[in-house]
Amino acid sequence: VKNLLRRVLQSAYNAVSHGSYNERLLEENVWHHVFRESFRTTQWKSELALSIGRWAGGASFFYILHRVLEDVKPEKVVELGLGESSKLISSYASNEDWLKSHIILEHSKTWIAAFCDRFQLSENSEIRRHDLFGKTQNCGFTDSLRYRDIEIDIWQHATLVVVDGPFGSESYSRMNSFDFIRQLLPESRFVLILDDSHRVGEKETLTEIRNLLSAQKITYHEKEYGGMKSCTIVCSHHFPWLASL
């Protein structure tokens, strides 16, 4: 009887997991279609090659990033982690005069060299290399992995912050985003996009971001967008429509 019950429970678990996977895969395909149809509207966009998914952001992430760039037109963007999203933001910096500054934080000299061999960044894009400290496992609020020694002026006047680095931590993942939130004022115009928000570490980070915003009496909107991976947007009251894309 116990073996039969165990097999029944395992079958039920497999069915739920399989169904969830299929639902996420279907949602991912829809996001791919939505992004493709909304993005390929000019020659430079049609010529931009992006590898979406796996270590890079998913289709929902790229659609949300594209919409924020189009709708908000940020003059300054700070990006945590060098990758496919850097191509998209830098291409906007090359082709749109409203994007004046794009700062990318990255820790790996090898990856920076490999990326720059394959892609020419805009003159308005700048990579700043910062070492990492902390750890990804058995960590907490004080010792999760993050970039070291980020100057406070990096965050000043940034309207958009994209968080897709460094590597995720089990707890309080990608905590450098707190430094950006702490320097905001109640009337600051801002958008923060956090990738991989389906993971526990990123969920803990989002909880702390909410706590910080509330403590600073900052009104904000928040929305998670799904697919094979999830990303979450947190924005000031100036951009309420970003929570219903």
Map each language-model feature to its residues:
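Short SAM/SAH-binding signature in class I
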Residues: I154-D164
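Membrane-proximal basic amphipathic "stem/tether" segments
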Residues: V1-A49
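Glycine-rich phosphate-binding "P-loop"
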Residues: E37-G57, P74, G165-E170
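S-adenosyl-L-methionine
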Residues: C116-Q156
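C-terminal substrate-binding/active-site "lid" region of AdoMet-derived donor-dependent transferases
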Residues: P166-L245
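SAM cofactor-binding core of SAM-dependent methyltransferases
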Residues: A56-F133
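A conditional alpha-helix N-cap/helix-loop micro-motif detector
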Residues: G57-A59, F141-S144, E170-R174
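Conserved acidic residues
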Residues: E75, T159, F190
